[in-house]
Amino acid sequence: MLPRSLKLIKKVGESNGLRNFGSQSNSYTLPDLPYDYGALSPVISPEIMTLHHKKHHQTYVNNLNIALDKLSSASSAKDVAQMIALQSAIKFNGGGHVNHSIFWTNLAPKNQDGGVAPSGPLADAINKQYGSIEKLIEKMSAETTAIQGSGWGWLGYDKANDRLVIQTQQNQDPLSVSGYVPLLGIDVWEHAYYLDYKNVRADYVKNIWQIVNWKNVAERYNTAKK
């Protein structure tokens, strides 16, 4: 039986193309970026993108594989105490893998429609619930910037109540642990912005909207609504 933390990560992982969650193989790999490391400059520098993707995300993948290998051994040995002890590592590193895999696709270079406002059902939902895209951005920016320590700001979909939600998560906790479908995430761990923005997180959050891939967010929304 899968621990609760792995079940939650498996669910959101499968919804984002990470099909080997819960398979017999525990070998997860770093996804390719859909653009070059320098494509998001000057909002995010090539140096940050390279470190963030090749070092930080890769570390989450490596540590997730290690934790799942240990879980497999503990399960075979029927070592329930060890299985329970591994849940925090699986949640943290699995969450880091899932969160970043979404994050990369949530962004796009300006010459590939990065920052272009959404249209269609997502735009209608935003206007109905928040009044305008500008008001959504203002609210989500304020809540994301105010996160204490490390974490993520999310725009999600609440299937039970058919509504959008703005939710912050600490550390690498995936949005799925709050019961929502992730649509758009903003990483506010310092490794995501410090080399470019130093300690001025607000400037990073303000500028990242210039490269949000609203087409990707809209596709996630349409899929979640089905």
From Swiss-Prot:
Pfam families: Sod_Fe_C, Sod_Fe_N. It is found in: Mitochondrion matrix. Keywords: Manganese, Metal-binding, Mitochondrion, Oxidoreductase, Transit peptide. Its cofactor is Mn(2+). Mn(2+) binds at H52, H100, D187, H191. GO terms for cellular component: mitochondrial matrix; mitochondrion. One of its GO terms (molecular function) is manganese ion binding. The keyword Transit peptide applies. The keyword Disulfide bond does not apply. Its main location: mitochondrion. It comes from the Eukaryota. Binds 1 Mn(2+) ion per subunit. Gene3D superfamilies: Fe,Mn superoxide dismutase (SOD) domain (1.10.287.990), Iron/manganese superoxide dismutase, C-terminal domain (3.55.40.20). It is an enzyme of class 1 (oxidoreductase). It catalyses: 2 superoxide + 2 H(+) = H2O2 + O2. One of its GO terms (biological process) is superoxide metabolic process. InterPro entries: Fe/Mn_Superoxide_Dismutase (IPR050265), Mn/Fe_SOD (IPR001189), Mn/Fe_SOD_BS (IPR019833), Mn/Fe_SOD_C (IPR019832), Mn/Fe_SOD_N (IPR019831), Mn/Fe_SOD_N_sf (IPR036324), SOD_C_sf (IPR036314). Its EC number is 1.15.1.1. Belongs to the iron/manganese superoxide dismutase family. PANTHER family: SUPEROXIDE DISMUTASE 2 (PTHR11404), SUPEROXIDE DISMUTASE [MN], MITOCHONDRIAL (PTHR11404:SF6). Destroys superoxide anion radicals which are normally produced within the cells and which are toxic to biological systems. This is Superoxide dismutase [Mn], mitochondrial. It comes from Dictyostelium discoideum (Social amoeba).
